[in-house]
Amino acid sequence: MKAVIFIMDGLGDRPNKDGNTPLKEAKTPVMDKMAKDGICGLMNAVDVGVRPGSDTAHLAILGYDPYTTYTGRGPFEACGVGVTVKPGDIAFRCNFSSVNENFIVTDRRAGRIEDTSELEKELDGLKIDDIDIIFKESGGYRAALVLRGPGLSDKISDADPKKEGKRVKEIHPLDNSKEAKKTAEIVNKLLKIAYEKLDKHPVNEERRKQNLPVANMIVPRGVGQVPEIMQFSEKTGLKGACIAGTGLIKGIAKMVGLDVIDVEGCDGTPNSDLMAKACAIVETLKDYDFILVNVKGADEAGHDGNYELKKEIIEKIDEMLDYITKNIDKDEVYIAMSGDHSTPIEEMDHSADPLPILIWGKSVRVDDVEKFDEFSTYKGGLNWIKGTNIMPILMDLMSIAKKYGA
């Protein structure tokens, strides 16, 4: 038996004035058929009432306790874009953002700029005092930053003001150590250098001509050191792979030992080639026991507060699932399908609202649920579970779970 965990990033939502969500209103005949043929429930990736990040959520969904394994998002972002993070390195996730001359943020995602490869070159390889700067774009406005050198600490604050109209925050040490003080000073110097180098860069001059937001600042956050994590194959006995478009999810996969399968045209944006991803899932199942799949677009729409786009992306995912379910053997493959967190249109950010979940495959206890959405699956046989329950349930269905007790 084989298994797929299929995560629709940011899937969940809250009802609008008509009582609908993008998922409830979307035309999803395949998801609904899977719900009818499977076992359903609700799921909180980390815990009830906890607003999870995509990083902590995916760790939990893979069976890892995020409270003991998560040190910050930065190491996963860096790992995901191919940086080999070494002991002592300090890693951050970053946004390219638009700021004015006073560092007031005018667009947190620089107009969702799609190509920042030329801007990356301005920062990667810099040296500030005795610290080497490693900087890699990780798709669109996202990037990873690594500081390498002596006497560093991850006990520092973030630069992200989290809202437009606010100034990029100065980095401060969070303890009294000389290492934290030094690290904060290095990052503050880097932010000034970044603005000087990026503001007049030809890429941004061209964006100004086109009346597009410029990417003239980097905003680091999610600082952390590399955690020690048991490899997925050792933990489960399964040969695992990951198919995802974003650096963060690829980084989590690499950190736990999943092979990352790159798919052309799948970049984690709303324009991602979902049918190419569907084909890759079917092909990858020929060589692997387990696949973690992440489809990002609905989350992007949620963060933008775009109801119609989120609904449209969910309908495209349904078409993707149509291809997958028609080209795999239900008697040989289990699919656990859910989200990693809710990204409600009204919040434009992650929330702790529980997610619909289903498990589809041979010998599941089919319940009475007939539609896959936030309001229907609560009646299902899975009841209300946490993300860390998914892998044990799948392993039990696959008849590879170890018995607890005599």
UniProtKB/Swiss-Prot annotation:
Instruction: Extract the CDD domains matched here.
Output: iPGM_like
Under which EC number(s) is this enzyme classified? 5.4.2.12
One Pfam family per UniProt: Metalloenzyme
Whether Oxidoreductase counts among this entry's keywords is no
Gene Ontology biological process terms in this record? glycolytic process
Q: Which UniProt keywords apply?
A: Glycolysis, Isomerase
Could you name the domain of life of the organism this protein comes from? Archaea
For molecular function, the Gene Ontology terms on record are:
metal ion binding; phosphoglycerate mutase activity
So what does this one do? Catalyzes the interconversion of 2-phosphoglycerate and 3-phosphoglycerate.
The text of the family note is: Belongs to the BPG-independent phosphoglycerate mutase family. A-PGAM subfamily.
What name has this protein been given in UniProt?
Answer: 2,3-bisphosphoglycerate-independent phosphoglycerate mutase
- The record lists the organism as Methanococcus maripaludis (strain C5 / ATCC BAA-1333)
